[in-house]
UniProtKB/Swiss-Prot annotation:
Keywords: Amino-acid biosynthesis, Cytoplasm, Diaminopimelate biosynthesis, Lysine biosynthesis, NAD, NADP, Oxidoreductase. Gene3D superfamilies: Dihydrodipicolinate Reductase, domain 2 (3.30.360.10), NAD(P)-binding Rossmann-like Domain (3.40.50.720). Transmembrane segments: none annotated. CDD domains: DHDPR_N. NAD(+) binds at residues 12-17, 38, 102-104, 126-129. NCBIfam families: dapB. NADP(+) binds at residue 39. It is found in: Cytoplasm. This is 4-hydroxy-tetrahydrodipicolinate reductase.
Amino acid sequence: MADTDIRVAIVGAGGRMGRQLIQAIYQLDGVALGAALERSGSSLIGADAGELAGIGHNGVTVCDDLTSIVDDFDILIDFTRPEGTLTHLEICRQNGKAIVIGTTGFDEAGKQAIKQASADIPIVFAANFSVGVNLVLKLLEKAAKVMGEYSDIEIIEAHHRHKVDAPSGTALAMGESIAHALGRDLKACAVYAREGYTGERDPKSIGFATIRAGDIVGEHTAMFADIGERVEITHKASSRMTFANGAVKAALWLSGKNSGLFDMKDVLNLDLL
């Protein structure tokens, strides 16, 4: 580790995403693994984080107490569960540590807690850290402005059998991008399930369909369907490394900032498109 490297702590270091985040850290210059965390009672406590990630021994021991390692990192990356992330967020706020949040499934109170914490510390909070997905979000804004008023809009997403929230955070972000471009409130126009006799489709609605099966990493399609034609904008992820690399790049971008709430559009400068 060079003296100038940004030290990153990974929450859920022994999970699939955590291991790939550690791998991503070792593939990028200017960043180093400072600490690794797992839930209390995990059999991985005390293990070497580098060995867990398949990169060899690195001397970073997995622990279960974030407060005990606050001096070992500059930025925390958290892709876990909402309740745990909010606990870690408060510890970061109290200790002046930046945080990158990839956790999905927050309720409105959780989102508000993140916003409030950003007054004190810098936060990147995004539903998806893939460069491609965030480009898609920008493309959807443009497509909605051209076709959205006269097209039926549907969002279809597919993930692995272990994903616990639905629709995915990315699907909701796609819906928000479209709704915002059309001046609509997603909460009012979203349709999350159809069953039985539903009547005709509300032309102002944005529909969501969810698939959970096998080991699908993540697939999202937004459809703008008119009579005689439709446009589909699709993103398919084949590896979690695309999310891991994006999150670590977000951590590097966040370094040196004092406070504020940001997303991947800020990290990638997509508002310039």
